[in-house]
Amino acid sequence: MDGMKQVGGVWLPEHETHLVAWMKKMNQIVDGKLSYQLDKRNLALQYVKNWRTAVDVGGHCGLWSMDLAKRFEQLHAFEPVALHRACFEKNVTGANVNLYAMALGDKDGAISIHTSVGSSGDSYIDGAGDIPLRRLDDFDLQDVDFIKLDCEGGELPALRGGEQTLLRCHPCVIVEQKPGRAQKFGLPETGAVAYLQSLGAVLRTERSGDFILSWD
């Protein structure tokens, strides 16, 4: 496994440069550590009604989960890349944290992940492999009040695999839908947003390619 480094109190892959530059530029500090997308996260959390269970799909190094684990009673995070999980485990601690070594989709399978040197957050599903792919619904999570999805174009399949969870729990959802990402997989650019709306979710706002939806 490649190495890790600590920047502003946060563990990241040794090769990471993009996030380092961005986090230092923004210089947002939470609990004495550099934070990532703090304003966007706080915007989304305004629409959370209860604080029982959060789900982080594309947990990466825990940059969102560091905060979510302190706000919610339970946190479930899914991250398929071993190096990212190693960073996550250093960044996010607590008995309420559950980290799963897999990706989420709309079927069971096994996939590979392409990782980008210098910008680890740009990792995406890249064909078949040996990393487990599972459906969120198979975990039968209860009282899910918040879901964050950032899986570089794979958001729509991940949501489809969690349809029963979405309909049962009506969580607040923030989903990334940046231009060109979903199209790599032959999916509509904002297909995940349209899918959530088809289930009854209401689009609340959008910020730099991330869409926030919740149920009335």
What spans do the regions from the language model cover?
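S-adenosyl-L-methionine
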Residues: M1-A95, A192-Y195, L203-D216
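Short, charged, surface-exposed secondary-structure boundary motifs
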Residues: A86-C87, G109-A110, A182-F185
